[in-house]
UniProtKB/Swiss-Prot annotation:
Protein name according to UniProt: Undecaprenyl-diphosphatase
Origin species: Pelodictyon phaeoclathratiforme (strain DSM 5477 / BU-1)
Membrane topology: Multi-pass membrane protein
InterPro entries recorded: UppP
HAMAP family for this protein: Undec_diphosphatase
Amino acid sequence: MTLFEAIVLGIVQGLTEFLPISSTAHLRIIPALAGWEDPGAAFTAIVQIGTLVAVLLYFWKDIFIIVAAVIEGIVQRKPLENSDAKMGWMIVAGTIPIVIFGKLFETQIDTTLRSLYWISGSLIGLAIILFLAEGKIKNRIKKELPLKAMENIGWKEALLIGLAQSIALIPGSSRSGVTITGGLFLNLDRATAARFSFLLSLPAVFAAGLYKLYQTWDIIVASPEHITNILVATLVAGIVGYASIAFLLNYLKKHTTTIFIAYRLVAGTAILYLVATGVLQP
């Protein structure tokens, strides 16, 4: 991997990590179209640490309040008395499914599921599901039924959205895409679904990044070039990711997810066509 490739892939990661269009799919397809080597699942997981930092910086006040409340609750032996502490524990509980499934299917995630057939199928399939979720929300708005804000999220919502997050282990599905979709099905308003999605990502992305960093450490440190490329890609991903968070949260306050649904359908269909015509190898 060249420094130029690292910068491009960092931009791609930052742009697509938080938009419901799948960063993994783009990190797989763009190198294939450009004739570059597949950076691999390990590269993707490590560079996600950059976007993790973007979430930490953007939501630092929320995170500080939640962590402080959790610690206070533990000290006072009343872990769930405070709503902020409860949110912290719900995020932890919502992370458990993806940790379990991620470990169980680690080999398939790193190999078989990176096939362009899987990626295109995930892009199209989740677009259809997001379309159905969007229709459900539009129907509630039309009937003037209430939608849930952050303070209305309970254990049911946290656990079900956490379970939905496990689907993101399939490249092409999009972690933010499946969690936002899950939130919409559970009647969260669009901006709240995105906000909770980003907070829920923290433990999973951090754990996956550290795990892959540990697994590939010897390869990374074997070459100064590898170290430089990883650091640059991670830094760029963080900077671009911060802007992506701000964009999506503001966008979803006034707009639907229709543009992302359309993009996923077009991208998934285009990938299938390119594979079928031999332009890309699956």
